[in-house]
């Protein structure tokens, strides 16, 4: 995959502190890792709860539970961010 691929991150609501909302705090590390690798990142909210999907060229290349991503940070120590980056790099 070229270094300047457009990656769409589709994410759903999740429950925290008794409320269910769209929150982007758990996506900070994922966005940072993808941008550092030269990719353009677009965020899209979806109706599904607790899900993150990475879309490259119209194809879903990675999916995980949003609550399993590390909160905040740069994503360098989060193993799910490394898996997601690998999936984007090997997408075609």
Swiss-Prot record:
Pfam families, A to Z: UPF0728
Disulfide bonds: none
InterPro entries: UPF0728
Family per similarity comment: Belongs to the UPF0728 family.
Name the record gives this protein: UPF0728 protein
Organism lineage: Eukaryota, Metazoa, Chordata, Cephalochordata, Leptocardii
């Amino acid at each position: 995959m070229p270094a300047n691929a457009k990656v769409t991150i589709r994410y759903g609501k999740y429950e925290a502190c008794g409320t269910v909302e769209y929150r982007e705090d758990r996506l900070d590390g994922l966005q940072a890792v993808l941008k550092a690798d030269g990719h353009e990142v677009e965020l899209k909210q979806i109706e599904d709860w607790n899900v993150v999907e990475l879309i490259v060229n119209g194809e879903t290349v990675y999916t995980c539970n949003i609550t399993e991503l590390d909160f905040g940070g740069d994503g360098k120590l989060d193993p799910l961010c490394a898996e997601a980056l690998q999936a984007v790099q090997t997408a075609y």
